From Swiss-Prot:
It comes from the Bacteria. GO terms for molecular function: large ribosomal subunit rRNA binding; structural constituent of ribosome. Keywords: Ribonucleoprotein, Ribosomal protein, RNA-binding, rRNA-binding. This is Large ribosomal subunit protein uL14. NCBIfam families: rplN_bact.
């Protein structure tokens, strides 16, 4: 569960290392974001010469959460860190060209096939 002020790892090569959620998109008083939800983030820590710099405000899709996601068969997929992939604000396509770490199948349903195809492992 991601809410405002939550810090996440950037799971792509956009140049960001740490980002902070500043808004959960999709509803006027929506409190939590789960895997596959789009959030608004600000870059808190970035590498030099990256595509994004510290202070940039972008959209991001949540790809891993410590809370996890429950499957219809009753199993729960959990991760040890919260992570997201940064998106272009207008096209909602990934800023980076590589995805690091596994992502879940739930992204396939949420119109993020580009992220699923770039990911090294889909759980």
């Amino acid at each position: 569960m991601i809410q405002m002020q939550s810090t996440l790892d950037a799971a792509d090569n956009s140049g960001a290392r740490k980002v902070m959620c500043i808004k959960v998109l999709g509803g006027s008083h929506r409190r939590y974001a789960h895997i596959g939800d789009v959030i608004k983030v600000t870059v808190k820590e970035a590498i030099p010469r990256g595509k994004v710099k510290k202070g940039d405000v972008l959209k991001a899709v949540v790809v891993r959460t410590r809370k996890g996601v429950r499957r219809p068969d009753g199993s729960i997929i959990r991760f040890d860190r919260n992570a997201c992939v940064l998106l272009n604000d207008t096209t909602e396509q990934p800023v980076g060209t590589r995805i690091f770490g596994p992502v879940t199948r739930e992204l396939r349903n949420a119109k993020f096939m580009k992220i699923v195809s770039l990911a090294p492992e889909v759980l």
